[in-house]
Amino acid sequence: LLNRDTSFLKKTLLVGDLFSESLRSAIDKFVVTYSAGITSYLNNINASSPFPRLADMWKKIMLKSHFIAAADTTNLMAEIAQVNRVNTLTASASTTPDEMRYLALPFFGRICPYETPAGKKLGLVNTKAIGAKVIDGMLCTPYRKVKRTSNGIEISNKITYMSVKDELGKKFGDILTLQKDANGNYMNTPIIAKIPNPEASDEPFIVATIDAFDLAGGYVAAHPEQFLSPTAALIPFACCNDTNRITFGLNQIRQAIYLQN
């Protein structure tokens, strides 16, 4: 999912694409095996029977690929989380280095930083954020333009979706740190922002404190909670750094069995 050399998110493949690729590969092997079995049909009729091979093909696709968690239907929220699941394609979860599991700035608005299973799949099985959308195979997140005005700055209502590549060279401010005066105008107070890295580095962005008016020409998030998954957004005060509380809450929501009348 993430290319650590450039901090770019790689192209996102849909479940249907992965399934089609696995099915085509399995069918090719099945045809070869079945054709060879036909030659020994008279000696052993079971050797050419397609049903055992079809069963083996199906088991390989469902159990040895990335579809093992394709049917989490404990409750409605578990289904929603499953629909928004994003898996990192890797050969083995047990041998994947820790560098592939870490959070990165390009994840903002695309991958929820909290909703990931513990254990070997930590950081490899993730959940798409609320505002994230797959456009041309890339995970994009919505922003709003910041414009310079006579009173300082104002935020446009127009939504612009950007991929990680589109973000290069632009400034992005934290909308929660912007403050307004009594007249409803934004004040030139310090804010937290993601700005281009002035030094030559593999990381294209750094997090810094800048004046609000310096954000003119840049962008802010379309919604304060767009970096959270739909399930994580239900946790009260999820914007704080209490990771354990949020993780436990997510597990409880997904595993709850609701009572019926």
Predicted features and spans:
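Covalent nucleotidyltransferase core used to form phosphodiester bonds in nucleic acids
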Residues: 132-138
